[in-house]
């Protein structure tokens, strides 16, 4: 039996996007967001612009049926507070709040998988920022502290593994995850 058949749907999704995820992680690591305040402010600016686009994701009606505290998971206000703590202006950026309004459930679930999965990296970065820049959940690193809260959350993987999805919906799930990563790379290229 091929190994791929032994993987859960969430594990297959993770494997399907692993190359682009690794590429983003390596690029962010090379930018050294915890090395100094200027690098960290650029990182927060990137997160802010990306989170602006995600507002509609946290309002998607179908996701609310399955994901507890979905509204609480948005971190845009925390990034605003962090940038304010650091006396850094908010970027002038157009919002795209309706991107997810009529999107297919499997597609937005793929996006959410990427966003929530990024919390593992953010939690690690939060520890580095606290150690190297002396920022924390009270000043300058609220966003990263909140990410740490959800980094061990298995609810989403459980949902992905147990939903009844046809082949097309499974492909749409992967497409959503890939689009989320490509969109992040787009903003990363613009801001760095």
Residue ranges and their predicted role:
Residues 1-192:
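Metal- and O2-centered redox machinery and metal/ROS homeostasis
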């Amino acid at each position: 039996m091929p190994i791929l058949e032994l993987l859960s749907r969430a594990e297959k999704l993770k494997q399907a996007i692993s190359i682009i995820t690794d590429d983003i992680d390596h690029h962010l690591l090379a930018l050294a967001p915890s090395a100094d305040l200027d690098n960290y402010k650029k990182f927060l600016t990137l997160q802010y612009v990306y989170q602006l686009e995600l507002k509609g994701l946290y309002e998607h009606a179908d996701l609310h049926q399955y994901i507890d505290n979905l509204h609480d998971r948005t971190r845009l206000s925390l990034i605003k507070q962090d940038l304010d703590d650091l006396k850094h202006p908010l970027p002038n950026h157009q919002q795209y709040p309706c991107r997810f309004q009529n999107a297919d459930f499997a597609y937005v679930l793929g996006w959410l998988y990427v966003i929530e999965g990024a919390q593992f990296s953010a939690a690690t970065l939060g520890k580095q920022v606290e150690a190297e820049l002396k920022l924390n959940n009270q000043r300058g690193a609220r966003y990263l502290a909140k990410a740490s809260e959800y980094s061990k959350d298995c609810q989403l993987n459980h949902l992905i593994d147990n939903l009844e999805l046809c082949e097309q919906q499974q492909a749409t799930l992967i497409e959503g995850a890939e689009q989320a990563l490509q969109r992040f790379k787009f903003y990363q290229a613009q801001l760095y």
